[in-house]
């Protein structure tokens, strides 16, 4: 069964991007090179979902080749209410509306591989509201922004969340939480 996972980095005060939708703060923090989590986790991902702002940031900062560099040949579903530039020869669908039909399409296509919710937080919240979010994986950094795009702009209580793992890696703490559907 396809597992829906929100994997992102956030600041100590719970933001995934600053008030200009920038991730520059993230690259100032040393990455724990000794961490093998990504190498173990990423092969389980069959496809990606992201919002328009995340997609635009990726294009602006990495160019069209960044999709293949970061995600390989994995298909993507980009939620948007505006026209966005496609990336040639990359399997991307621009979608809008309810997350359930997109999840069903992705799950059927991925054949049991996991679906990575790249962001943003409100889109992830919509997956949660639809009962589709299975896991949250956060790399928390020792940075505060004071404002910006929140990690998950929803009230989700401990009745629905359970800590599974926490690990200090360099200057980051990785937290894995299970989400009850």
What are these regions (language model features)?
Residues 1-181:
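Enzymes that bind and transform nitrogen-containing heteroaromatic metabolites
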